């Protein structure tokens, strides 16, 4: 079991990266160096460095600047919509890095909640995706208005549903795997469930509180997202799988695509 100070360093670097966007590349480099060094000496903190590095990598990928056409509404219904493709490419990079870290540590997907799911579990996840997605798509703009101001989005164009689903599933798969998969599970090893839940929720909330076009203070967004992180974490621990958190998260992300890629001129 690593010492408290030693085990706390990667978490401090993670929270710094989440709160201060310009620090993310530097914190990612520090965490990768820490991961390589701790793997070489077979230190138990290797899992912490690996988990935190993967989360910061997802933040960096999510923050990559997109072309102007991604947000002007002109590519809203295109299957090649940049807003969807950029996120899908980032998700593939992050999930590939997750596989690499798992292999380096001799771990398996089942250890982080990536496991075979029963037909009943698949049906539940699909049902949640459809039900929550429909509700979120039509009431999401109204709920988001206090945080981001009016969102003049076009929701009636069903041809935009395919790129919206691509964006939503890619983003949810990436974030749930790193936050509720590796981070939650591996922080639990050294710090226990309560600290792990708090750490992943805090990082999740802080990461969503920077770089946005907020109508006022970002603090309500940070708080709401952190509460969402707690809920997703509880579901992941309760079910032992990431499929239901991914489905619900993806459903909630569908209106985010519309709000960013389908803005009216």
Where are these regions (language model features)?
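N-terminal, membrane-interfacial amphipathic/helix-forming hydrophobic leader that caps
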Residues: 1-106, 257-265
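Transmembrane helix-loop-helix hairpins at the membrane interface
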Residues: 7-29, 126-265
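Membrane-interface helix-boundary motifs at transmembrane edges
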Residues: 37-50, 111-118, 184-189
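Juxtamembrane helix-loop-helix connectors linking adjacent transmembrane helices
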Residues: 70-91, 96-171
């Amino acid at each position: 079991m690593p010492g408290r100070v030693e085990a706390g360093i990667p978490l401090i670097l993670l929270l710094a990266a989440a709160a201060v966007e310009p620090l993310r590349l530097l914190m990612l480099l520090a965490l990768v160096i820490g991961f390589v060094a701790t793997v070489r000496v077979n230190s138990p903190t290797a899992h912490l460095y690996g988990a935190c590095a993967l989360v910061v990598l997802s933040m960096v990928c999510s923050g990559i600047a997109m072309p102007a056409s991604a947000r002007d509404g002109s590519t809203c219904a295109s299957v090649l919509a940049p807003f969807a493709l950029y996120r899908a490419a980032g998700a593939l990079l992050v999930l590939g890095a997750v596989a690499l870290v798992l292999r380096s540590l001799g771990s398996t997907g089942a250890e982080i909640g990536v496991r075979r799911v029963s037909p009943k579990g698949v049906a539940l996840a699909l049902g949640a995706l459809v039900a929550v997605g429909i509700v979120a798509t039509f009431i999401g703009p109204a709920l988001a208005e206090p945080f981001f101001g009016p969102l003049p989005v076009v929701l009636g164009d069903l041809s935009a549903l395919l790129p919206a689903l691509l964006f939503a599933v890619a983003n949810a798969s990436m974030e749930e795997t790193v936050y509720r998969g590796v981070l939650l599970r591996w922080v639990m090893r050294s710090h226990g469930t309560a600290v792990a839940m708090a750490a992943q929720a805090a990082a999740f909330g802080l990461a969503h509180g920077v770089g946005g076009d907020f109508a006022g203070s970002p603090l309500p967004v940070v708080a709401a997202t952190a509460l969402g992180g707690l809920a997703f974490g509880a579901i992941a621990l309760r079910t032992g799988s990431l499929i239901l958190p991914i489905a619900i998260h993806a459903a909630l992300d569908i209106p985010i695509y519309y709000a960013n890629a389908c803005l009216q001129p």
